[in-house]
């Protein structure tokens, strides 16, 4: 049996939670999304454990770093894969001031996004994101934030296929932005970055120890990174996130 993060397994789980074939579990993304759609109660749905409901500061920092890699500075459209309930999607539409399409396997998550996190620039689609993922639009940039195919495995072939399918949805000069917690405790795409760059024939740039809250007070990437390293030693745990840009 494959691990839960593979697209076909995620779809099975999504259907099971949505159709009440399994016991409700708010620790699971799909269980939380179902509860949130029904109640719009942030606390009782435990949505804060699954989605960043206040992502503005984080996304502004990512945009600031990412902008230098965009050949087309006037972005007309953004793709947000694994968008969940749409909090980040809506904010991205506001800070970029352009159209954005959020895609997630969760029907409940997408329905919540349509109801509560929509504006004139947002579109939401419930669809599985696998090696055959293909929409009818070409996007200028794709955001993949805490996206399971990149955060839960170092399966090189799987990640190559997912990234290839994402780039099939991007314009010729499109950019893929990956943002996730930086940790040495589990296997992630960080194990494969350089090899993926070669296989995909894409340039790649990585930033480690990215921490929006620290950056707010120390608005210099290298100094804020140093602060994260020091805090990590003091606290004996990982501090900060990793930003990976394929372009």
Which residues are covered by each model-predicted region?
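Conserved SAM/SAH-binding beta-strand->alpha-helix loop
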Residues: 106
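Conserved SAM-binding strand-loop segment of SAM-dependent methyltransferases
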Residues: 119-130
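Conserved class I S-adenosyl-L-methionine
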Residues: 2-70
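A conserved beta-strand element that flanks and buttresses the S-adenosyl-L-methionine
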Residues: 143
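Conserved beta-strand signature within the Rossmann-like core of class I S-adenosyl-L-methionine
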Residues: 173-180
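Conserved SAM-binding loop
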Residues: 113-114
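A short glycine-rich, Lys/Arg-flanked "PGG" loop and its adjoining helix->strand segment in the class I
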Residues: 158-172
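Conserved SAM-binding loop of SAM-dependent methyltransferases across substrates and taxa
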Residues: 85-96
């Amino acid at each position: 049996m494959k691990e839960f993060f593979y697209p076909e397994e995620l779809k099975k789980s999504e259907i099971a939670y949505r159709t009440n074939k399994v016991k409700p579990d708010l620790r699971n993304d799909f269980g939380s999304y179902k509860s949130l759609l029904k109640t719009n109660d942030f606390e009782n749905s435990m949505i804060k454990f699954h989605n960043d409901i206040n992502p503005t500061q984080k996304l502004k920092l990512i945009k600031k770093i990412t902008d230098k890699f965009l050949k087309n500075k006037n972005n007309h459209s953004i793709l947000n894969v694994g968008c969940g309930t749409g909090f980040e999607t809506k904010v991205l539409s506001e800070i970029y001031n352009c159209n954005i399409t959020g895609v997630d396997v969760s029907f409940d998550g997408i329905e919540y996004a349509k109801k509560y996190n929509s504006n004139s620039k947002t579109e939401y689609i419930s669809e599985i994101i696998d090696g055959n993922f293909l929409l009818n639009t070409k996007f200028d940039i794709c955001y993949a934030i805490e996206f399971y195919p990149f955060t839960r495995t170092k399966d090189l072939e799987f990640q190559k296929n997912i990234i290839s399918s994402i780039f099939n949805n991007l314009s010729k000069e499109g950019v893929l932005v990956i943002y996730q917690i930086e940790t040495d405790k589990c296997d992630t795409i960080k194990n494969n970055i350089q090899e993926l760059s070669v296989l995909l024939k894409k340039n790649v740039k990585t930033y480690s120890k990215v921490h929006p809250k620290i950056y707010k007070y120390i608005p210099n990437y290298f100094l804020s990174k140093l602060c994260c390293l020091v805090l990590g030693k003091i606290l004996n745990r990982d501090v900060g996130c990793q930003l990976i840009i394929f372009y």
